[in-house]
Amino acid sequence: MRTAARSGESGGMDSTQNKALIRSFIDEYQTGADERALRRIVHPDVIDHSRPPGISPGIEGVREQFDGFRAAFSGFRATVLHQVAEGDLVVTHKVFTGRHDGEFAGVAPTGRDVEIVVMDIVRVADGRIVEHWNCVDRLGLMMQLGALPIPSGAVPSGA
């Protein structure tokens, strides 16, 4: 991918602007499903270091992932809990919520309300997301869906 900025530089945007850009992406695309926001904010050749198997690279992979979440979880939305930025990097701790009423990861709809805890790191260059890393509590999600047993005495988020 070619960008004008190197790691540590964000193409003239400061940390506050980078955080606002990521908030816009979360509100307008992840929650709002606005395709224009996706194209405006995410570089076409974004590198997703956490891309699941079978998902396309680049912006198309971002679209595939969120189309899948929206198909599986009605009312899908993101709530930002914490956000910090330094230079061209923005870290966001957030929770996705929704009702499981479509198949997800081979699990038939359960009708359960779920919470998916996520930590994202994104790199911004020239006003666009160019790189992404994340940690998703997939284990907790699968326990909420009943696909995995809940360890004795444990209560997963969303339960």
PLM features per residue range, with description:
Residues 1-159:
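C-terminal and inter-domain tail/linker signature
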